[in-house]
Amino acid sequence: MSFNISNAEILNILLEGGNLDELTSSLLMQRWLNDEISDVQTGAFLSALRAKGCTGVELSSMAEELLKVCELPVARPNLYMVDTCGTGGDGANTFNISTAVAFVAASCGAKIAKHGNKSASGKVGSADVLLNLGLNLNCSLKKVISAVNEIGITFLFAPVWHKSLIKLAPLRKALGIRTVFNQLGPLVNPLRPNAQVLGVASEDLLEPMGSALLKMGMNRVIVVHGSGGLDEASLQGDNKLVFVEKGKLRFSKINILDFNHENIPNDKLVVSGSDSNEEILKSVLNGSGQKSHKDVVALNAALVLWAAGIEDDLHKGFNKALFSINQGNPWEKFLLLKTYLSSDDLISP
């Protein structure tokens, strides 16, 4: 595909249901980054990509362009790191499960580099609830990176690292639908973690997201689509998984019944706003929360412990995570990170 191809020509390919090759996908993202695509065209591209569905090649190519313009202020930590960032956009209004999972997995020994943002198309994002709990996201990038070594977990606030995409946030919010940027968010962690557990809001995203992460060189990945449409493993029924390991994709499923726990409908995980999210997150992390909340976090944490190489047996990982929750260890991990980041209050290299 020629670099002389126009925006309109690229759009026509998508509108006709065609897939973009690696070069054209990269070019499209470069033009977004260089402000060569208008808001009207952006809306059309986002809608066309959503209607067609993105391929692994399109996603990985666009993600690599975003990572090229995201330079680290210091060397990447020489650690085996895991991310728990998912696509969001499932519309279920559950509490921030993946955020809780990050602290639980860290309390079990995983090194977590959690990439996240404020809400784009949902109600409350991971950054929203962490800010409301007092976590300082306005600190130097060096401090953010060093927290992985010092505490075992860090949070990378996406707009700080991907400033070029801030201008698209109002349009994404106005559209109110899942877009390619929901899919790209989990693929562009600046620390380039070695492994990831990635929740997707649509079953159709399982294969392309797994393929994208495989193409980007991830060691171990689980892409999960939860029963009832959650972008997490749920307690309601069968959860569909794609394992990425040793250069291959493997499809599987898990059900909380396999862990000798009962099925619970997704509406038991729903909250009404950020205040409730804060309360639920804290109660899960300190071990005082509802059984259903603790169980769903432990189930997803088991997936992270597999990705981290800590526990290959998901049943043992589930029990390990649940034990840590009931001991209140994840809340202690959160407080350590909160204290560590509070001593630095200047966004700078």
Swiss-Prot record:
It comes from the Bacteria. InterPro entries: Anthranilate_Pribosyl_Tfrase, Glycosyl_Trfase_fam3, Glycosyl_Trfase_fam3_N_dom, Glycosyl_Trfase_fam3_N_dom_sf, Nuc_phospho_transferase. GO terms for cellular component: cytosol. Its cofactor is Mg(2+). Anthranilate 1 binds at residues 86, 117. Mg(2+) 2 binds at residues 231-232. It catalyses: N-(5-phospho-beta-D-ribosyl)anthranilate + diphosphate = 5-phospho-alpha-D-ribose 1-diphosphate + anthranilate. Pfam families: Glycos_trans_3N, Glycos_transf_3. Binds 2 magnesium ions per monomer. Pathway: Amino-acid biosynthesis; L-tryptophan biosynthesis; L-tryptophan from chorismate: step 2/5. Keywords: Amino-acid biosynthesis, Aromatic amino acid biosynthesis, Glycosyltransferase, Magnesium, Metal-binding, Transferase, Tryptophan biosynthesis. Its EC number is 2.4.2.18. Catalyzes the transfer of the phosphoribosyl group of 5-phosphorylribose-1-pyrophosphate (PRPP) to anthranilate to yield N-(5'-phosphoribosyl)-anthranilate (PRA). Homodimer. This is Anthranilate phosphoribosyltransferase. It comes from Prochlorococcus marinus (strain MIT 9312).
